Amino acid sequence: MEFGVLLLLTLTVGFLLFLVSQSQPKTHGHLPPGPRPLPFLGNLLQMNRRGFLNSFMQLQEKYGDVFTVHLGPRPVVILCGTDTIREALVDQAEAFSGRGTVAVLHPVVQGYGVIFATGERWKTLRRFSLVTMKEFGMGKRSVDERIKEEAQCLVEELKKYKGAPLNPTFLFQSIAANTICSIVFGERFDYKDHQFLHLLDLVYKTSVLMGSLSSQVFELYSGFLKYFPGAHKQIFKNLQEMLNYIGHIVEKHRATLDPSAPRDFIDTYLLRMEKEKSNHHTEFNHQNLVISVLSLFFAGTETTSTTLRCTFLIMLKYPHVAEKVQKEIDQVIGSHRLPTPDDRTKMPYTDAVIHEIQRFADLTPIGLPHRVTKDTVFRGYLLPKNTEVYPILSSALHDPRYFEQPDTFNPEHFLDANGALKKSEAFLPFSTGKRICLGEGIARNELFIFFTAILQNFTLASPVAPEDIDLTPINIGVGKIPSPYQINFLSR
């Protein structure tokens, strides 16, 4: 549905809903300043067509690092800048640990699952997930071994192209998805498996739909737009199809479960369900399982694969950086074994390049919404319990107080005078605090192993000259993706 039609519909019903809103109890508290909202419309007129991020960054210039916007009738507090975000999510971690609502996902997730739960449900599921994914199955293959296996499969697949140009999107989706599938489902899929290809297609299409203008408008007025056509309808359909597939996988696991030898995340969860079946208040139920698996699969596939697409586009733009990384690979790893996470500490330049790619690419500029769990005083303002909070991670990744050239790709941002890796408090691609990305450790190891394995085995080439490569991303709502490109992987 086009923006103009949505706006007209909003204005048409706005008066009636405004009358309803006047009968509702007012929010107590003293929220940060912000643009004056219109009845029901909120700050719709301050939101430009380029999306929430551009609108918020413009408002930051006027109102500072902490301000309030009204997304439709509901107030949302916006946090900008490294210090502001860390002060909230780290220094007052418990108060800001609630999960806000993502309107286009809520009809499916409904507060279930490790990513979208809040309160004790979230704490219970997060503890379980962290332990299960870190110590996965006593005596079983480690997560890193699974990543290395996928890296080897990728290298063999790329060799089949014999240096011919290709769009790497599908292969990068496949290796990221297979890593999480191996952990959660206990198996990896062939790159030509039809069901696997269909799942990847659903993930990609759903991500694009979530970034559409229609979805952003839905975020403001979901209460009545849910009754009309729009991207949210297809998102719901896609997610339900993925849930049905996951439910089928869960039933297969249940039928073949061996309590003495859990194979994966699902097996481990089913064993915990059985252990707590007499506890009527347990959070280990079917709904939390399937939504957790859906969340892990979706997040683990799209974010890592998009980062890899950005990574190699940037390497094509700056071939001297790729050459320097290859030199470090040759010195530390050589050519006769796959990289391991342990190699990273001996490869500061490569590590700095990966850090800078994540910072510069800035793929998730607006973190998932938070919600304060109690009345909270923050920088002199009173945020009532359940106030939603948006941390603008992009404002940290491009914070001029921490990065000398925030809008320029420069690995030196993460190297000290001695060439050692330099940490930065502004490096927040995974967010921070209690809600930091559950799969941060896995994602970091994936990026390192996949990146170094490819450059260990291949020299990169492009049909386009480096000076003509455009790194300007495509903005999809609250996220970014690189423009499609072709790349040649030439065997070294």
Swiss-Prot record:
One of its GO terms (biological process) is xenobiotic metabolic process. Belongs to the cytochrome P450 family. One of its GO terms (molecular function) is arachidonate epoxygenase activity. Its EC number is 1.14.14.1. Its cofactor is heme. Keywords: Endoplasmic reticulum, Heme, Iron, Membrane, Metal-binding, Microsome, Monooxygenase, Oxidoreductase, Phosphoprotein. The modification Phosphoserine is found at S129. GO terms for cellular component: cytoplasm; endoplasmic reticulum membrane; intracellular membrane-bounded organelle. This is Cytochrome P450 2B12. Its main location: endoplasmic reticulum. InterPro entries: Cyt_P450, Cyt_P450_CS, Cyt_P450_E_grp-I, Cyt_P450_E_grp-I_CYP2B-like, Cyt_P450_sf, Cytochrome_P450_fam2. It is a peripheral membrane protein. Preputial gland, but not in liver. Cytochromes P450 are a group of heme-thiolate monooxygenases. In liver microsomes, this enzyme is involved in an NADPH-dependent electron transport pathway. This isozyme seems responsible for metabolism of 2,2',4,4',5,5'-hexachlorobiphenyl. Pfam families: p450. It catalyses: an organic molecule + reduced [NADPH--hemoprotein reductase] + O2 = an alcohol + oxidized [NADPH--hemoprotein reductase] + H2O + H(+). It is found in: Endoplasmic reticulum membrane; Microsome membrane. PROSITE patterns: CYTOCHROME_P450.
